[in-house]
Amino acid sequence: MATNTVVGNLVCSDGTNIPLKAEIAEGTESDLTTDTVYTVSAQNIGDYAPGKVLVAGSIQADNGISYAYVLSQGLVASIIPVSVKGVSQEVPMLCAPYQLKAGDKIRVLTLTNSARNASLCVYTAQGVSRIFVATPTGAGTEQLLDLQTGNAIGDTLQGQTIVKGFGSSIDGSKIETMGAYVVDALGNVVGAVPLSDPANNAPIFSMSYNIPVALNFKAQYLLNA
């Protein structure tokens, strides 16, 4: 896989900006560190600005991008909006303010412009951020599974309610559902999150969801190819 120059900017509650930049291989989740032009040395954000409170951010790649997040003590602590360069018109607010801790990192998955990786990024009323992913190879129903555990959404978020979310996929007209559906144990749709192509429309968190999640629920979408 080729490398690409990934850039970003994080905004803190006190007005501090944290510029990010790194050469990252497409198709491999990697650390995104601070931009050495402005921060002298490349550092992970938790070591560069411990105690600062993130309130907004955007991360952009050359050809394709699936997701970005703050990794803290092994968990997804905060999800950062993503896009291909030249698409985003703003630095979006995060779902909730997040105070950086020493050791925190930005993790990002960049892609080629033809990679079909899909992601569903959600935030719950209980304050939990999670990412669900899939890599389809053809037609059929594709389940999105937890990035860190490989579990279904019902196992990961049992008893919680999704209140914010966005989805990412380049598949466009190949998708025959209204984005990613959350379905209950009987297959009934209890919520839907659009899947946007980050090369054409920067995915941003919608604030209008009220999607309950229980055991045996799934996140999935249907493809015609």
Regions found by a protein language model. Name each.
Residues 1-225:
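Beta-strand-centric surfaces of beta-sandwich/beta-rich domains
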